Amino acid sequence: MFDLNQSLFLRALRRQPVERTPIWIMRQAGRYLPEYRKVREYAGDFLNLCKNPELACEVTLQPLRRYALDAAILFSDILTIPDAMGLGLYFAEGEGPRFTNPLQDTKAIHTLKIPSIPESLSYVFDAARLIRQEMPKELPLIGFSGSPWTLACYMVEGGSSRDFKRILNLIYTEKEAAHLLLSKLAASVTAYLIEQIKAGVNAVMIFDTWGGVLTPQNYKDFSLAYMHQIVQQLKKEYPDIPVILFTKNGGQWLEWMAETGCDALGVDWTCDLASARKRVGGKVALQGNLDPAVLLTTKNCIRSEVGSVLASYGYGTGHIFNLGHGITPDVPPENVAIMIEAVHEISPQYHL
């Protein structure tokens, strides 16, 4: 039987030697694929798709059938936890995620219940079990969650925001309530990731999409401290399950992030991979960081930019190739194939 620990992805995460650089793509199951759009149409809406384990399994497997990827990522949404807390998640056409019951005052934070994660989010774990059963045995499955700070941003703002005025006001004027909210979310995220691990995921990733809007001190206090807590708890219970942290626009804080005990850091395209490796490569693996916009260009441009990312990281292990953020819906599927082939062709020279 194939030992999953021998997979390229898990070996690179642990900074063990690999024959070539592994690759997967954030949002690899997504709207750029015509087969995904068909299933989503059948589901009726995005949330129905997330909450139906069979359909979530199908869309998770779609990119694996099409491309030679080195990992699958569980199909779900980062806002399942706030939805389970009773905030009423829905997706408005062209507006992204919204909540019918956002947290409008500190009273709402105090009365916010921590849900029973195994029961309220059973559809996620059912999907994970089904995916693990149906997907190629030699490929790892990645589980994920939003970070407490990122979830809090959506919950207080009522959806995505341009300026995050309400949540920033909260951390400056109602620190205690902000920390209470983040503590409740950290407990829920920890429980959520543990249940995903029990359901069969082989690595987990924490998406801190909005950590980059904070000042350095506020990032430490209101985002990183809670991710640190989660990593420590996960490592205590599951020391062999790798944890990846990703803060968008967080390139200036890599050293702090590497101190959490995580195994790898996701880096976006604004961060120089060579200097990131110099700074933290002795402690953690790095994942990234092709600019997603490159996938809207030409074959030659894609191959050249893939080569630049690989050269920037340089020789040796500890690099997982990915985009610097999620793939966009307008990317031609054939351009994804060009990127993957380029990684397969160019990266072996860095692992001789």
UniProtKB/Swiss-Prot annotation:
Gene3D superfamilies linked: 3.20.20.210
A biological-process GO annotation: protoporphyrinogen IX biosynthetic process from glutamate
Record's catalysed reaction(s): uroporphyrinogen III + 4 H(+) = coproporphyrinogen III + 4 CO2
E.C. numbers: 4.1.1.37
Domain of life: Bacteria
Annotated InterPro entries: UROD/MetE-like_sf (IPR038071), Uroporphyrinogen_deCO2ase_HemE (IPR006361), Uroporphyrinogen_deCOase (IPR000257)
GO CC, alphabetical: cytosol
The keyword Lipid biosynthesis appears for this protein: no
Binding of substrate, residues: 27-31, 77, 154, 209, 325
Site residues (Transition state stabilizer), renumbered to this chain: 77
Pathway: Porphyrin-containing compound metabolism; protoporphyrin-IX biosynthesis; coproporphyrinogen-III from 5-aminolevulinate: step 4/4
Subcellular localization(s) per the UniProt record: Cytoplasm
Keywords from the named record: Cytoplasm, Decarboxylase, Lyase, Porphyrin biosynthesis
Family named by the database record: Belongs to the uroporphyrinogen decarboxylase family.
Assembly description: Homodimer.
Family annotation (HAMAP family): URO_D
Known function: Catalyzes the decarboxylation of four acetate groups of uroporphyrinogen-III to yield coproporphyrinogen-III.
Name of the featured protein: Uroporphyrinogen decarboxylase
Biological classification of the source: Bacteria, Pseudomonadati, Pseudomonadota, Gammaproteobacteria, Legionellales
